[in-house]
């Protein structure tokens, strides 16, 4: 019974997921490791709804890392962050990219230009350019759509 955590060999979460105590310990260790990878190990026992927004971004990435992906898809990881947190996120993405492939969907062009080595630029659902950062940043279609005509 899920509510009977004192007499069972598994806790509420592990019981609901059908995990043994050993599996629960392994899963917790993977979660701790993922939090360490995003420099958030100190928040492991805190409620997610009590964390500042930039830290919740780290927790979201850590949740994805628990599954030990070969490809990590990050959807606007810098969205809603201030300049200092964006700088930190750039560093984190660089670090993660040494451990797995990263696909980044992002509108902050400074983030894109600093962390990507190959770009596919879409405008209204159409690929308007692809290639390395230098080539794409000079493409007139990209400049007009995203970087501004004055660049």
Functional labels for PLM-detected ranges:
Residues 1, 8-43:
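Conserved ABC ATPase "signature" region
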Residues 68:
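Conserved catalytic motifs of ABC-family nucleotide-binding domains
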Residues 72-76:
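Catalytic Walker B motif of ABC-type/P-loop ATPase nucleotide-binding domains
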Residues 86-98:
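Helical segment within the ABC ATPase nucleotide-binding domain
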Residues 112-114:
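A short, surface-exposed alpha-helical micro-motif characterized by mixed small hydrophobic
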Residues 130-131:
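ABC ATPase "signature
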């Amino acid at each position: 019974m899920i509510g009977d955590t004192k007499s069972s060999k598994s806790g509420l979460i592990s019981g609901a997921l059908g995990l043994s105590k050993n599996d629960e310990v392994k899963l917790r260790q993977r979660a701790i490791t993922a939090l360490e990878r995003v420099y958030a190990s100190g928040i492991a026992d805190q409620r997610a709804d009590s964390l500042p927004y930039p830290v919740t971004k780290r927790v979201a990435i850590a949740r994805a890392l628990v599954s030990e992906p070969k490809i990590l898809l990050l959807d606007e990881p810098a969205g809603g962050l201030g300049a200092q947190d964006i700088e930190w996120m750039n560093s984190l993405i660089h670090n993660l990219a040494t451990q797995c492939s990263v696909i980044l969907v992002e509108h902050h062009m400074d983030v894109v230009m600093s962390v990507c080595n190959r770009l596919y630029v879409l405008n209204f659902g159409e690929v308007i350019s692809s290639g390395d950062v230098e080539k794409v940043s000079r493409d007139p279609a990209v400049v007009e759509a995203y970087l501004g005509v004055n660049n």
